[in-house]
Every structure is written in C-alpha cells, then in structure tokens.
Amino acid sequence: MKLTFCKCCRWFFGLALLLVAMPNLLAQQHWSEARANGWYAQQPWPVGANFLPSTAINQLEMWQAESFDTATIDRELGWAEGIGMNTMRVFLHNLVWEQDAKGFEHRIDVFLAIAARHHIRPVFVLFDSCWDPHPKLGVQHSPIPGVHNSGWVQAPGTEILQDPAQYPRLERYVKGVVGTFANDPRILAWDLWNEPDNGNADSYAKGDPKNKNEIILGLLPQVFAWARAAHPTQPLTSGLWHGDWSSLATMPALARIQVEQSDILSFHNYSWPEDFEQHVKLLQQFHRPILCTEYMARGAGSTFDTVLPIARKHRVGAINWGLVAGKSQTWLPWDSWQHPYVNEQPSVWHHDVFHLDGTPYRQREVEIIRSQTSAR
C-alpha cells in the first residue's frame, strides 16, 4: 500500500510539472533562419514611414474612440501609397486596450481595412519606452509650441513598469491583441518594444525608473513569450538602436536578447549613409531578414537620397520617421527640447515627408522614393 501511494504521488507530481510547463511547450517557437528568410522572400521590399495621423499628438489620441480619425488616416495613407510606400509602423497602447478591448480591436480592424485599400501592411508596435512616462487616457494636451514630439507617451507608463504585480495586465494586452490578429495577412510584423532601454536623457529622464534597464532585461523576454503564446503567423521583432553590434559578445545585454528573440531583425539609424551601411553589414552576420524601422533625420545626415539606395541594394526594409507634419511636430529637431523653435523655424525639416495639405516638403525626395519603390 505504501509503494502504491508513493507511485501515485510521483504520478501526480509529474502531472503537475507537465501542467506548469504546458504553456511553454505549446507556445510557438522562435523562427528558424530558414523560416524567416523564406517568409521574407515572399514579401515585396518593405518601404514606409512611422505613421501617426496629423490630427493626433500621440498613440492615445490616435486610438481612443472619441478622436479616432478615419478620414485623416485614409487621406494620408493615400499620399503614402502615391509615392510607393507599402508599410507603416504604427504604435498601439496598452491603456486603450484596457479601457475597451473590443472597441480598440475594432478600430485596429478598421485601420487595417483602410490600409489594405492603399496596399499598405503595417508593423504594429506594442510597447514604447520613449518620451512621457506618465500616460493618461482622455483628452490629450495641445502641442507645446516649438517642441519636437511634445505629447508622445510611453507604454507602459512608469507606474506599471516598476510594479511586477501589474505585469499580468500587460500579458493580457499582448495576448489579446496579438491573438486577435494572429492570422491576419494584412499585418506585416509585430514590433514588441520600441527602444526598450531608452532613458530619455534629454527630456523625461527624471520620470523614468533609475533601474529601467534592469527592469526591461527581465520583462522583454516575457513579452516575447506572451506574443509567441498567441501563435502569430507574422514575425516578431524588437529593434536594436545603440551599442556595439560587432558580435553577440560585444552587444549590450538587452541587444543580445533582441537578436536572440527576434524572428526578423530590426534596427534604428539616424546617421550618415556610411554608418547605416556599416550597421546593416554587422546585422547580416545573423543571417536573418533586416528592417530599419527608424531612419531619416535630415540635419543628422540621414536622408532619403542617400539611405534608400543602400537599403534597396541590401534588400533591407526602410521605414522613416514621420509622414505628415502634424501635431507631433517631428519636423522640429530633437534639440527643440532645450531650445524651442518658437520665433523661428529650423533651417531644414528634421523628419516628415508631407505638409498638411499633401504637398511634399521636398519634391525631389518623393521622386526618389517613388523611383526606388517602383523598381522593387
């Protein structure tokens, strides 16, 4: 009787371990190089912009029901289509999902329908560590005169980020959104976290947790696991944006996680074309498709004229920052946080392609974009 009891104990203990491990066993695995490259071979060369409708100051104003502006979205995506763009990088927000998950997912579906009419497949961003660390639902404040991206908010905010007891909220959001659209061919990819360890040194540094990097090192792998548990047919990524990428050994710890967890690689580069190409070549050592999900800062040396031909040569996806100069005011340089452009405008636009009426900032630029994309 004692032997039988012990056997039963071992059986139940083994079953318990299996049940605990089951979610991980059932979760989708990291894509192999072959799968990632096979997927990319079937895609047209991705070229587009980071998109926020000109009537929104941030992600919350874009997606909340009261300010969701389909007319502007349709009009501005039409301008993007007209110059050959076929993707947009679009930021979501966990607070909007928590407020009304079904309503938010319906608005995402509406956005996807509009984008599809313009032959655009977006990359959706779930979390973002840049700018204001205290997002609040409701009416958003007006743009601060003369200041670049004066209303953009982080997702999640500091209050959630530094409290692990609230992480189940983030897990529900990731699994909810990715799960709802896991099989949607209108979506190109999921960018799980934008610049995760950005400390916002020149803007909101005092509002960020002092141990932000440590927090993100523990949280980002969980976010990848949550997204994989939803079994998306689209690839997952999180973009490298600083550090030495010569090898995994020289990379910051967070960058290693991004490389090792991403199905396709992505990165940001706002520097000269020589630097852009150098970073492309460094990432090619990992033998996976590459997207540049942020570039084009004219005053810093990153331009359509010089970067797009390099991206096309290496078949690296190219997604510049900014489409239409609107409430985000990203045509203003980063240094506007120290010196607002109130009484004068910058000598050259920092980001963005179109004026509010659809007129290109530089006609030659849109001709270059159209020329490069027409030769896909």
Q: What does each model-found stretch correspond to?
A:
Residues F276-Q284:
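The feature captures the conserved acid-bearing segment of alpha/beta-hydrolase catalytic domains
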Residues W11-N24:
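Bacterial N-terminal signal peptides
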Residues P333-W337:
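Short, surface-exposed amphipathic charged segments that create phosphate/polyanion-binding patches used
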Residues Q363-R376:
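Carbohydrate-binding surfaces of carbohydrate-active enzymes
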Residues Q29-S262, H268, P273-E274, F286, ...:
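Active-site mouth of glycoside hydrolases
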Residues K2-F13:
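Bacterial N-terminal signal peptides that target proteins for export
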